[in-house]
Amino acid sequence: MKKISLLFLSILSGMGLCQAQSYTPVSLPSMFADHMVLQQNSSASVWGWGTASSTVKIIGSWAEKDTISAPVDCFGQWKAVLPTGKSGGPYALQVFDGTSKIVLNDILLGEVWLCSGQSN
């Protein structure tokens, strides 16, 4: 009986975590900003926060016909994979949820290299 009541309480407390929250404007981490470069001919992961149980839409001006939709989970987090095209730019990236909108400008698509090493 004790195990059943403990299980019941844990389920109830877990359900409380995913209750509907008040409106939260769509937002992105600080690494997504104007003047950024995305790798060409690949898939770029874009993520952020919004109102729980809503949908966020992402449009890159390099492929305006392709609108990517991402569901916002009960914790207010979302993630989408955005296909990138051939090199070029400047482009814009729009992220919106129907009420709030973020527009990132001057985005370039090209080669992104990460170099590291030891300096002596």
Predicted regions located by residue number:
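Intrinsically disordered, low-complexity segments enriched in small/polar residues
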Residues: 12-16, 46, 74
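N-terminal hydrophobic or amphipathic segments with adjacent small-residue motifs
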Residues: 8-10, 14, 42, 70, ...
